[in-house]
Amino acid sequence: MAAKTAGGGRWEVVKKGRRPGAGGSGKGGGGDRRALGEANGVWKYDLTPPIQTTSTLYERGFEKIMKRQNKEQVPPPAVEPKKPGNKKQAKKVATLTNQNQKQGRFRSLEEALKALDLADLQKELDKSQSVFSGNPSVWLKDLASYLNYKLQVPPSEPTLSQHPHDYPYSLVSRELRGIIRGLLAKAAGSLELFFDHCLFTMLQELDKTPGESLHGYRICIQAILQDKPKIVTTNLGKFLELLRSHQSRPAKCLTIMWALGQAGFTNLTEGLRVWLGIMLPVLGIKSLSPFAIAYLDRLLLMHPNLTKGFGMIGPKDLFPLLDFAYMPNNSLTPSLQEQLCQLYPRLKVLAFGAKPESTLHTYFPSFLSRATPGCPLEMKKELLRSLTECLMVDPLSTSVWRQLYPKHLSQSSLLLEHLLRSWERIPKKTQKSLQETIQSFKLTNQDLLRKGGGSNQDVVTCDSACKSLLQQARGFQLPWTRLLLLVLVFAIGFLCHDFRSHSSFQASLSGQLLQSSGVLPAGQQACTKIYSYSLQGYSWLEKTLPAWGSHLLTVVRPGLQLAWAHTNATVGFLSAHCASHLAWFGDSLANLFQRLQTQLPDTLNQLLRSLRELLLFLYHSILLPTWHMLLEALAQIQEHCHEACRGEVTWDCMKTQLSEAAHWTWLRLQDTTVAFLDWALAMISQQ
């Protein structure tokens, strides 16, 4: 509270000549409240506009108590020269003060909240609102001061890491939450200044040796940021400057980080803004890194649906995290580094966003530049996985790789070898684009080897990997030409050896085999017939071809000559009058072909994708339910047959059941027909 803050949190003995209103209030409580900037005089810069200074009712109440106690504790004038009496009186007052402090502390926050008198709190707030009706910031400060004064428990560490994320607000009763939220709604325009007041007051209390517990201010901060997280995220630059100004005081830095981090537990986007703007810049500081990583872990654990955080992390944020996670001998301890490694895959998903097929090529250059032969093994594995993902998901990554290839030969050799090892797991579409890219790399390697540019060893390694990849891409193919030639040579050699060893074809094994199988006689007969028919055909052509040829030439020649003349005239006319139109038509046709080549594959792919979705819809919506219904019907029929046949299904039983079913169907059809006829006759008779 303001009065308690001004008084240092203790009752003090006021000497006779001292004015009781010197603690920050005027006479009778009518003075002005100190401005927030004055109360927070520790800061060397003005972060927010000053709040209008005025006293609060709660301060006045404390000042009246202090005045009454001071009047009782100030000795009378006649006894003033007696110093021993003054010392005894001072010791008694100090003892009473310590007892009052001890009585004001509870063993736990649960006990303090149970002992809190909500009626008294509401009464004080009503008084504050009636007296300071035009100053909502006073109401809020009274609320925070009252809660913090009443909720005095043994101090805890600044980040409350042993408690749930919403502690201490999670312990607040429903009635107290209603009071707090109602007052925050009434003073909605002063919430930003109230947040600054709570934060700065907490930091001031940390400067005091027997400082108070700060649960009242913590509860107010959590209540504000549950509904208004942008109070923090719109002023991250201001709070980062504040954090850096207290870098030598870890307790204050952790308190600031805890307070700002409360904005992220209800909204993943705001939480990532706080972490990237406040905690990432201090990652690596020994006293602050554990809380920063623990907060990120808790934030991602509370928001498993990462889609709301897409677009928050960019390349400038992801790659410092990659270096922190995988580079050895950095400012993080091994345990924190391992924890960050476990969080990195989810951070990568957040960075790639909702459309990785159009964004991954922007990450490819940084991934490739880090994949050096000397980088740590775990980092190398992660980089190669990320590079492969870029090539498989974003088609533009291959063109980016082509541009970077001549200046990143050592990194490209590692990636090529990794692609060779994992070629079978790469989709066919990606394999095709990679094959074209590797073919261009092969030409680049030949040019570099011929010119002697770059490191020859890197070029040789890349060239070898490219050749292996191209061979792997083509796959294993049988040399059919060589196999046929080999079979032909083997057959000719076998026949020659067979004929030579048996002196004749009839005596050879081949001849005997062909004779016994009937192939040789059939072949001889076929050859005889072919020969005779060929002779007959030749003789017929020899007789008829000259006569028919001369007759055909006589009939067709005039028409052909006339057509040739008309064709020459038409071509001459077109060449003389339509040359420009023909050129335009040729250009248009070429453009049309080019457009079809570029757009038709996408259209066909879209058509095939739509057809696939239609077939899947038909399968899931019609075919699969129909199939299940058919199976259920067959199961019911089988069960009915078992019941009708008393467990033993025979053909006679099946015939009986089928005849009964047919008879029942026929009767139902007759009944339906008779009913329809009766209805029709009734309708006709009515008309």
From Swiss-Prot:
It is found in: Endoplasmic reticulum membrane. Residues 1-10, 20-29 have a biased composition (Gly residues). The modification N-acetylalanine is found at A2. Disulfide bonds: none annotated. Keywords: Acetylation, Apoptosis, Endoplasmic reticulum, Glycoprotein, Membrane, Transmembrane, Transmembrane helix. Its main location: endoplasmic reticulum. It is a multi-pass membrane protein. Residues 1-36, 68-94 are annotated as: Disordered. The chain crosses the membrane at residues 475-495, 614-634. Belongs to the TMEM214 family. Constitutively interacts with CASP4; required for the localization of procaspase 4 to the ER. This is Transmembrane protein 214.
